[in-house]
């Protein structure tokens, strides 16, 4: 089930022994620097704690929390395993795992817990000055390129971003033999990118490689952010510098 912060059940889902399918929220935004206001509580067959899929959904959907209740051989509740996203921290930890406990013995004021978490996220957002530049994460996939070439191209991309008035706050790279046709990067690295974008309070993700329309659309939906590639960034710079009507038409 999905439960809101008032304790009301908003969605009921039925899965199988391996997985459940969460609702498709489409482009319903959670708000920058904000969680979605829903926690997912579901059961696992046997003594399995939170899985990689659970943590991926927690990150991609920006849920308040992900809770998995194990079951005994008799079909009774076992332990409740819970995790929540962490704001940016010195340890670099993305997820906080709460101490497993029988469901009836969970000792957590969830409203207070999530209120403190969102206050911490709000404080981080307030460190941005009014009128400050857009903040971005740069992403590069090797796909057979040499490390030296990647480093040089990323340095060049940073300079292009600065020329466009964008503040680069992080860089994510992935080494893989070929790019993913749907997302450019792998699902594991996408999960990491979602969390880092959330923690860094960014507005924009810039890919070093050219994205297909399908890749750009899929990434924007998953990240809930504006996603562009190197070519689009260069066009943005031209557009900013175009003063005449003819110049603007040429950029378009």
Regions found by a protein language model. Name each.
Residues 233-252:
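Extended, highly charged alpha-helical segments
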Residues 1-230, 234:
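N-terminal accessory targeting/assembly segments
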